[in-house]
Amino acid sequence: HEKLIPAKNYHNSLHHLSHAACALYQTDYQEALIISFDGGGNDGFFNIYLTKDRDNIQLLEKYNLDLGFPYMSFGDYLSDIRKEPALNIGNLVYSGKIMGLCSYGNVNKKWLPYFENYYRRKPDGLNYKEYLNDLSNETGLIFDINNRLTGQTAWDLSATSQEAFENVFMEMAQPFLDKYPNIPL
């Protein structure tokens, strides 16, 4: 980046700490519990912070779990979503479209534990197809880019994935919400 953007000084910033600071400084909170998670940065995927004075944001926990990749990975297999030429391009658009499809679907309680397990297994660009194959065997869903899921099945997949995402998120967040019940999130 130094060759592309000339400057006198460069400051390296931690990705999630920057998210945490941005969130905090847009409020008037003196203390806060802050959760920053996304597809990753130079300081992890899912970080939980505590600040008690607006000047010091303390890292409480760093989970090595990317919830973004498994969430968006279903986009290739849903016919309501335009298939992108490569998953890394879909990474930028699939999640929002899947969120929209959730409203049409119903959570399939039989599928739910398998979807939660899919999230916990840390799928990434190298192993997600293997993990989707396991999910297929467990749920009966077929993940085939040449025969994409349609209608209620696709919508139920979206809703079930959303519920699994939220449940796994809460597994990580709840201990801190319990420990700091009077500190705003």
Where are these regions (language model features)?
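Short acidic/glycine-rich loops and adjacent helix/strand connectors
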Residues: 1-185
